[in-house]
Amino acid sequence: MKKILLLLAAIVMLCVVVSCSDDDEPKRGDGVFTVNTPMINHMYNTVTGEVLGLSNTHNKLTIDTAKHTASLELVYNNGSEQKLILKDVTAKPKRLGFYELSSPSNAQFRGYVDFNESSMRYYYTTESGLRVISTNAEVFFLKTHNVISYNDTTTSTDMSNVMYEFTFTPGMDNAIVKVMGITHAKDVKYFNSITAMNVPYTITANGYILSGQNIPTTARYISTIDTTMQTVKTTTDYPFKTFDVTVDLENDYLDAVYMMGSSATVVATGSTYPDYASY
């Protein structure tokens, strides 16, 4: 699916360059695409206060990138499979390949599609009061602010643009966490990625809380002082000694505090898209 969305992103960009047609019956080449995307439904009953388990779903999006319109078939399960069909969706371009979605007939709906990052997210509330947030299996935060304090308590580092990715699977109690692009100044290492395969999490009304201790990780890094061509090295020396993270889907917010082994503590905040934090 990610390859399909990346291909669509390239086609979307090409359509912008050649100025796609605005005919009443546009062809696929005119910028009309249909994508049936596997997604994860996060559900919360606003009437009873019950937080429901995650479920797999497929949501169908048809978007006309020339006319900035779309239609959606959103599938959710509340005892039985049900659908919310929106035929009057406005697809407002915010930047190349990124569209903010809204519906004049359904004020409870909002969302976005980002062909650049192969990402979609839909928010809606059903007539029965079920709040549904549909996300890709991977929930990521592209822009963050990070303060890294070292164990001698005398130094710290401020970093932006560290990326966080969380993968949730229905029926599983553990998530996959990946931290990308973080520098450990004291150990002179730049980490391409630090990956933890089994991070315990709970589902909340707004998203997820991830928490654990001594969580094994696999880290890929290069030296920050070696200016020669380097081969990426792998280490398991930076487990998450402590890990406490709030992923707030409803408000698109990340709040994280974790330890890289015993040598550094990271405090991170951020959002998926800082320019469009409120969809």
Predicted feature residues:
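Bacterial Sec-dependent N-terminal signal peptides
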Residues: 4-6, 14-40, 129-140, 256-279
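N-terminal glycine/threonine-rich, aromatic-flanked beta-hairpin/loop signature
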Residues: 50-85, 158-195
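Short, exposed beta-strand-loop hairpins at the edges of beta-sheets
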Residues: 118-130, 246-263
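Hydrophobic lipid-interacting interfaces of membrane-associated proteins
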Residues: 38-43, 75-79, 127, 146-149, ...
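Extended lipid/amphipathic-ligand handling interfaces
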Residues: 58-64, 88-92, 111-115, 162-169, ...
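Tryptophan-anchored aromatic micro-motifs
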Residues: 26-55, 136-161
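Contiguous, well-ordered beta-strand patches that form the walls/edges
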Residues: 71-115, 185-239
